[in-house]
């Protein structure tokens, strides 16, 4: 599979020759597709991880982030953030698009780039419903409807993918990594979520999950397994 993505074979440093820095909570969340893109494209990078800690009184301490939030030189302080040389940016999609542009994973034509952006938007819609439920005290009550809703969207994506290897074009784009990560998280939510209506996505997920670069990352110490933050009801 890697041969379909020549950009992944070139090691890349940050814009100033230093490793790219990703700042985010010590969870998958919005940070994981960024990490996967860095791994796939062969960037040198490092995690700066912030932790949400539950205190004895049941409240949550996020001071590891809030103590430094306005001291990092970010125009719009938020997590995740990316430091690439002298460039400091926030907002997940902006970060992904910047890295994809650098790595040649944004699509090769105007039509492909439009479809990549469409898949960004679709992923945001699905993720918002998933995250809203995961952090709700009514998660157990919401779970069946959430799974049904996600399964419907995945069935549409399965039809869009068809028998192709990649979601857009003839090679890997950032949209593939974005959706691989989401599907991987949804399989924790419900291991059967692809079984009835998504045979193409099952094969799609397996190809990325078993790619040597992804396997090496999953088996490394830097791989994070927690999906959502400590105060979530589905972690």
What does each model-identified segment do?
Residues 4, 214-235:
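C-terminal helix/juxtamembrane-tail motif
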Residues 116, 167-208, 218:
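GST superfamily/GST-like fold recognition
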Residues 119-122, 133, 180, 220-224:
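Short acidic/histidine-centered micro-motifs embedded in hydrophobic/aromatic stretches
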Residues 136-142, 202-203, 221-229:
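Short alpha-helical linear motifs
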């Amino acid at each position: 599979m890697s041969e379909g993505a020549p950009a992944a074979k070139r090691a890349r440093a940050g814009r100033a020759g230093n490793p790219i820095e990703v700042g985010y909570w010590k969870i998958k969340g919005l940070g994981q597709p960024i990490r996967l893109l860095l791994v796939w494209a062969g960037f040198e990078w490092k995690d700066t991880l912030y932790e949400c800690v539950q205190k004895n009184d049941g409240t949550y301490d996020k001071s590891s982030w809030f103590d430094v939030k306005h001291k990092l030189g970010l125009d719009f302080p938020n997590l995740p953030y990316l430091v690439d040389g002298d460039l400091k940016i926030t907002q997940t999609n902006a970060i992904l698009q910047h890295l994809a542009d650098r790595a040649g994973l944004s699509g090769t034509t105007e039509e492909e780039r439009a479809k990549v952006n469409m898949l960004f938007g679709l992923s945001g819609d699905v993720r918002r419903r998933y995250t809203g439920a995961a952090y709700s005290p009514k998660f157990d009550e919401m779970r069946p409807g959430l799974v049904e809703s996600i399964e419907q969207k995945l069935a549409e994506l399965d039809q869009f993918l068809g028998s192709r290897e990649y979601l857009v074009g003839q090679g890997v784009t950032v949209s593939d990594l974005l959706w691989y990560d989401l599907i991987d998280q949804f399989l924790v939510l419900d291991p059967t979520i692809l079984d009835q209506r998504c045979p193409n996505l099952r094969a799609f997920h397996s190809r990325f999950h078993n790619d040597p670069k992804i396997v090496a990352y999953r088996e490394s110490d830097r791989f994070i397994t927690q999906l959502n933050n400590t105060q979530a009801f589905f972690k």
